[in-house]
Amino acid sequence: NHDFTTSNLAAIDQSNSTPTNNFCKINSLVNQGLAAFNVRQGGTQVLTGGNMSHVGTMGLTAGKWYWEGVQTSVTGTNYVGIGVAAVDADQGNSADSLGNSFTGWWTADNAYHETTSQSAQNVSYNTGWTGMSAGTVWSVALNCDTNPYQMTIRKNNRSVGTYIGNTKAVVPLIRVYANSSGDTYHNFGCPHVSALAGGNADANGYGNFKYAPPSGYYAICTKNLAQYGGDG
């Protein structure tokens, strides 16, 4: 008989996502780029061999949103892109068109890039920042209530710049360079790695983040989207 006793199950392995309040996760149906695509841990962990963009399952058109991520291990040249992609960006597994058109910070040249079309981008400005290393926690605070939207990216809770975007309907994105591989974890409120579990919820009490979300910013989940996400 089964006595329903849990075994080898840590608190970090339990999800805050419920049938009445689903959190954003990595979209396993978007097989984007040239690399193998392996989504684990409830859509929060992605194993890649490189040249791959990962996007979230929930689109954003209004509201203020916060999410985090970390690479716990890296081999090879470690370039990552952190930001958002337009919901109508080109997709395909023969080239990383999502990564070629995202808006955000690209550590290969430490510059902010801005989408110009469904498959292209331009360098908006050079930042002078340093790149990313294993264990570095990044976070994004996205304000879709401004027109155009405003996005602030932080590294280990220190701001690395604020950028004004030129599109309104977006999904969260991270891009991994072709010559690197490793474990990438995303935290939209349900962390499955202790590096992203700091016990910080948003103002509505949703989510578990490494760092406290900025005032007025919320976890990407269905209850918050219903309250702040506009008409979609």
Tell where the protein language model's regions lie, with residue ranges:
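PRY/SPRY (B30.2) beta-sandwich protein-interaction domains
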Residues: 1-232
